[in-house]
Design a protein with these regions (language model features):
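Class I SAM-dependent methyltransferase SAM/SAH-binding core
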Residues: 48-96
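A short acidic, Gly/Pro-enriched loop at the edge of an enzyme's catalytic core
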Residues: 95-106
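A short glycine-rich, Lys/Arg-flanked "PGG" loop and its adjoining helix->strand segment in the class I
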Residues: 120-132
Length: 217
């Protein structure tokens, strides 16, 4: 619970500047990659975005779908509600979701998976709330030989700006989260024992980020 509270507190405190931060570290490509992730769940009539933050993914999703986002940060959800008034937002834990079994056609996570405290428990919950053959799409940072360069970029090249925007401790939190990234193979090894079949892996920005599409089996 302490880890989750720290995560919620950090994201609550940066909610006003979070979109600026994401544009900064992704060289303004964040929306392109989120749209690529959303293509993997195209046709979903019910969509759940886990760790929805400021609601950017749901804002870009099919407006005809029932769009729901959950997050641990109330401050983030307040921003999201202003952005996407036709979406539903719930203050909830991804490892204990307040939804009935087989509620959603698809689940998305944008730069969230590596922050989860108990990923096995989340995947069990995702299995439960997804309909049979439902889709899970994960966009996140890849752990491979270029990742240290991204850490260096954040630790030194843009650190002064990061500290101005978020403060030293919170900036260190984001750097540490990058160091905890999973490789695509590590992610695959977590998904498959928990009832998901990996369908597709796409890489962007020389492999620094990936979009992994999986199906509930």
């Amino acid at each position: 619970m302490k880890h989750k509270k720290i995560t919620a507190d950090v994201f609550s405190s940066v909610s006003k500047h979070y979109d600026t931060f994401l544009n900064l570290i992704t060289f303004r490509r964040i929306k392109d990659w989120q749209r690529t992730m959303l293509k993997e769940v195209e046709g979903a009539k019910t969509l759940l975005d886990v760790g929805t933050g400021t609601g950017e993914v749901l804002l870009q999703a099919d407006p005809k779908a029932l769009r729901v986002g959950i997050d641990l940060s109330l401050s983030m959800l307040k921003v999201a509600r202003k952005k996407c008034p036709n979406c539903g937002f719930v203050l909830a834990d991804a490892e204990n979701m307040p939804f009935k079994t087989s509620s959603f056609d698809a689940i998305t996570l944008s730069l969230v998976y590596r922050h989860l405290y108990n990923r096995d428990q989340f995947l069990k919950e995702a299995q439960r709330v997804l309909k049979p053959a439902g889709r899970l799409a994960i966009f996140d940072i890849n752990k491979f030989w270029l990742t240290p360069f991204l850490v260096f970029f954040m630790k030194f090249l843009i650190k002064p700006l990061g500290i101005i925007l978020f403060g030293r401790d919170k900036w260190e939190f984001f750097i540490h989260s990058l160091e905890n990234s999973l490789s695509e193979e590590e992610l695959k090894r977590e998904l498959e024992p928990n009832g998901f079949k990996v369908i597709k892996i796409q890489k962007r920005l020389f492999g620094i980020v990936y979009i992994v599409s999986a199906q509930r089996i």
